[in-house]
From Swiss-Prot:
Protein name as it appears in the record: Putative S-adenosyl-L-methionine-dependent methyltransferase Mflv_0743
UniProt keyword Methyltransferase, yes or no: yes
Keywords, sorted A to Z: Methyltransferase, S-adenosyl-L-methionine, Transferase
EC class of the enzyme, as a word: transferase
EC number: 2.1.1.-
PANTHER family in the record: S-ADENOSYL-L-METHIONINE-DEPENDENT METHYLTRANSFERASE YKTD-RELATED (PTHR43619), S-ADENOSYL-L-METHIONINE-DEPENDENT METHYLTRANSFERASES SUPERFAMILY PROTEIN (PTHR43619:SF2)
Residues reported to bind S-adenosyl-L-methionine: D134, D163, L164
Described function: Exhibits S-adenosyl-L-methionine-dependent methyltransferase activity.
Molecular function terms, GO-annotated: methyltransferase activity
Pfam families with a match to the protein in the record: LCM (PF04072)
SUPFAM superfamilies assigned to the protein according to its UniProt record, in alphabetical order: S-adenosyl-L-methionine-dependent methyltransferases
Family: Belongs to the UPF0677 family.
GO biological process, one term: methylation
Amino acid sequence: MSSLRTDDDTWDIASSVGATAVMVAAARAAETERHDALINDPYAKVLVEGAGAGAWRFIADEDLVAKASESDTEVGALFEHMKNYQAVRTHFFDAFFSAAVDAGVRQIVILASGLDSRAFRLPWPAGTVVYEIDQPLVLDYKSSTLAAHGVAPTAERREVPIDLRQDWPAALVATGFDPARPTAWLAEGLLMYLPADAQDRLFAQITELSAPGSQVAAESMGVHAPDRRERMRERFASIASQIDIEPMDITELTYEDPDRAEVAEWLAAHGWTAQAVPSQDAMRRLDRYVEVADSDGQSFSTFTTGTKL
């Protein structure tokens, strides 16, 4: 159970769940500058810089990361793992969309899109429509920031400013979404912020809106043992203190439900094919795996893809 969440909480890009999007974008910005980058996100840095002095901006600041690493020998490995994980995750789901459009899908839905810039940076085929669903203030920040820098989408982009706990299917259809057409759905960095029953409801709604041939991709997180969650909380608080930033504890924003359905199993039982890839396998395949202290197999995430029968 999350201690900082309520059934009707909202946020902008600088608070609560919204601020975690800054962390993800900062990791993409750092990855883009590597000589051996797995992804290219030329807009991540701009989106991070405009988000204010949040706790997660420092991930893209090598000097601050080095300072934190000097005071804790395990911090360097931890942040290398965090950045590599985000790079591998982004690479995996970029490839998912590439395969989907190669299969003829031209309708894309990104759930809880945050600072996702795929509508602006991926080479979408003509006729592709990308729907982004998220909190109104989050979508407004991204659109206004990129527009101010002269950045235009590479596909037709339609915003659906609504909380996923509300009637988002109706809002999506009202924006022009056609349930009769195959769709590629993405739930990246989302499910851990939903209670188990809300996750089931989300996939039921996706299934209801999906024509045969639709595809879905999702990231699901493993469950951390309580003692490991506490060690993570203490470590991040210590790091924040050392580099003089406001601490932020993601574990207080997420729902760790041991009865949460495995995504692949849920999909297979509801008319989809499904394949699950452990994130550590994806990281090893791309030579980006980093051993982190106190890690355990259950704490890793899984990347799941499926096709509607």
